Amino acid sequence: MADKLFINALKKKFEESPEEKKTTFYTLGGWKQSERKTEFVNAGKEVAAKRGIPQYNPDIGTPLGQRVLMPYQVSTTDTFVEGDDLHFVNNAAMQQMWDDIRRTVIVGLNHAHAVIEKRLGKEVTPETITHYLETVNHAMPGAAVVQEHMVETHPALVADSYVKVFTGNDEIADEIDPAFVIDINKQFPEDQAETLKAEVGDGIWQVVRIPTIVSRTCDGATTSRWSAMQIGMSMISAYKQAAGEAATGDFAYAAKHAEVIHMGTYLPVRRARGENEPGGVPFGYLADICQSSRVNYEDPVRVSLDVVATGAMLYDQIWLGSYMSGGVGFTQYATAAYTDNILDDFTYFGKEYVEDKYGLCEAPNTMDTVLDVASEVTFYGLEQYEEYPALLEDQFGGSQRAAVVAAAAGCSTAFATANAQTGLSGWYLSMYLHKEQHSRLGFYGYDLQDQCGASNVFSIRGDEGLPLELRGPNYPNYAMNVGHQGEYAGISQAPHAARGDAFVFNPLVKIAFADDNLVFDFTNVRGEFAKGALREFEPAGERALITPAK
């Protein structure tokens, strides 16, 4: 590689040359060096004056700005933003990304159609399917179809709610109104489309998006219930059933249970979360939700690191950072994986090393390959921190560096072997090497899972091993260590990106998010984060329509 991908960011962040070994502290103007902190101070004064209770005051506690309050370049973009703008509370795009996942459920029409034809003796045709879809798109946002005197939601408040379908049968898809169809042929490259259609076959699946405002007011588990209620009512209306007849129970079962795919599984009671909450989203599902693989299919690094960014934000910033810990500092761990092109630089190095020595997906799936590739990439990453002190200051936390170096090592190993388990083994080896070199990895407890994880990479036992694609945030030992889960999701994606696979874990999930009507663009995750940081992203679920005009 010629120029380091992170050099431009370092030059923008610091006055000194990236190679300079000395700098100054305490003379930088404190929080006033930051436009965003200054804005916060002024806003805090206004809030305090209005409510009569003191609010934001950065002079309380540890003084801010003793060192450079550096901007961050969102990787793959030319956008530099302040760190505060990458906190999910301050970033509408990040909020919408999670909203669009949480409010989605996939529901089959196959069982329902069998009930209609076999129990009720009625015919199901493309025309009746289109009529049903017209009905359910009226009902899903919160409108009535079979009852009188029902209150309804304002269409403008729930404009993001709709239902589409997809099928692997081109003839059926062509007969349904295209407004309601996710066109696999249009959305995916030809080879990916053929694979996905073969997986789906003649089945017809609904992709339901309930209103953002509903999932925000309630929770993820509401999604399937809201969906099932409107689907049931729409079936009764579209196929002219009597609401109380026995077949209605079959429709309810199909819509609520039989053919329902949640984006996240139910969590144990000690975590107290239902379906479609972050802790239940498997790494392989998150990789399929991210859509980079259908537009950047010739660049496995880009594809894998877009998944890392998706997971770093969801798992680290929202799940561990707020659901689980209630803190604010977790953003700093997550941003290390998707800013300043550092992880990109390390991973492109690894990909080129693999290509030159083995060829993508051509290396033996052995520990010798793990030892070779993961060691090479780890040493490269550690050398960059030694050579460029500004890089060390950029990622000032040991856990940031450990996550980034290990992610590059894991993805690169997966590129070589076309196997996520060997990629995971490369991650753990990188952690051991890093600790040998620097004597520590991160804050106390950061490396808990890294000290014991290697023992269950290749053993698939009850609570001690799963293919990485099937693991998730609630996997044993993964549950409370920041700076891991997004990277694991990226390593899940890496072998599939190197092979050019159409999906990672579930083809239905991959297709469901290949949808141009989604508010968040899952083909360009990091670009959307940048738009959110610049306050240029327009989210759904806003309440301005029902609040006083200002």
Curated annotation (Swiss-Prot):
Enzyme Commission number(s) of this protein: 2.8.4.1
Catalytic activity field: coenzyme B + methyl-coenzyme M = methane + coenzyme M-coenzyme B heterodisulfide
Binding site for coenzyme B: 225, 256-257, 270
Modification S-methylcysteine, positions: 452
Pathway involvement of the protein, from the record: One-carbon metabolism; methyl-coenzyme M reduction; methane from methyl-coenzyme M: step 1/1
A GO term, aspect molecular function: coenzyme-B sulfoethylthiotransferase activity
Positions of post-translational (Z)-2,3-didehydroaspartate modification: 450
Modified residues (2-methylglutamine): 400
Alphabetized Pfam families for the sequence: MCR_alpha, MCR_alpha_N
Gene Ontology biological-process annotations: methanogenesis
Name of the featured protein: Methyl-coenzyme M reductase subunit alpha
Annotated organism of origin: Methanothermobacter thermautotrophicus (strain ATCC 29096 / DSM 1053 / JCM 10044 / NBRC 100330 / Delta H) (Methanobacterium thermoautotrophicum)
Encoding gene (name): mcrA
